[in-house]
């Protein structure tokens, strides 16, 4: 799959990411997108959630929110931001958090699947 096809499947702002953060280098941008395939933060966030360690969930969700913002992954950025806001507010139920984590998991997995299919720039 070509980079320019990615927005058909994933909420992503390629133009802004390329212009603002990757000096219009598609090769560098794709290289950084592919780094998502090897990050442990998402797995660690899931493990923390399973253990009920919401402070760790906050930490990893915040990290992932920043990474997604840098990469222009607007959909995932928004979902991680929602998790961060909910945890910071302290006004949440475990089922609310679990619902948000299930939603972000689906988008995370789908996004990684499409990133795996990217051709080198």
PLM features per residue range, with description:
Residues 1-59, 63-121:
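Two-component system phosphorelay core
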